[in-house]
């Protein structure tokens, strides 16, 4: 009985060894293949935008004019930098972004079938929140609404920048009521407003839209944002 058990264990160990070898042989090349097939910088961390074959050639041409087709140098600040250094970096970077967007959008016409207005609401602490509202002309009945939260890392840019004005009005031209919220950034031209000031502004804007759905002629509300605005969109929904 002892000899039989030992032989069985030896056979089982041998089979296990073969299975492990077969596993690594079969999976190894496939893993390398999958790694090579990953798109963009997931597959090549040193891939420059100009070498990404997925990019629209017209977009590449536009970005190349501003030197945005190559790998950007690392920023001079990090999470380890002082608050003062980070705020100085934000203050220096913001005009560059705003100038870029102004240059791009100065030759792009805005829709001519949109009505725009600005409203100022107040939160429970008396803080004023500016809302930019765009709606289509000559449309009756209730319409879906989009609360748009702009990008900028929650640190720079404003809802009144030309790229965001164009985006909101383009959506409104497609029969949506679009509200852009001027939330407080943590730096830049809108000042140093520590978190969660900006998030609270977004939440109060959403509450105001919901409370005034009848007056505004709104059927449903969608919250949308990109980049830092996408972060605030998720946070607004969660809170």
Segments from the language model and where they lie:
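Catalytic nucleophile-loop/oxyanion-hole region of alpha/beta-hydrolase
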Residues: 159, 163-170, 179-220
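N-terminal targeting or regulatory segments adjacent to alpha/beta-hydrolase or S9 domains
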Residues: 27-109
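Bacterial Sec-dependent N-terminal signal peptides
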Residues: 1-40
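Short beta-strand element of the alpha/beta-hydrolase
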Residues: 142-152
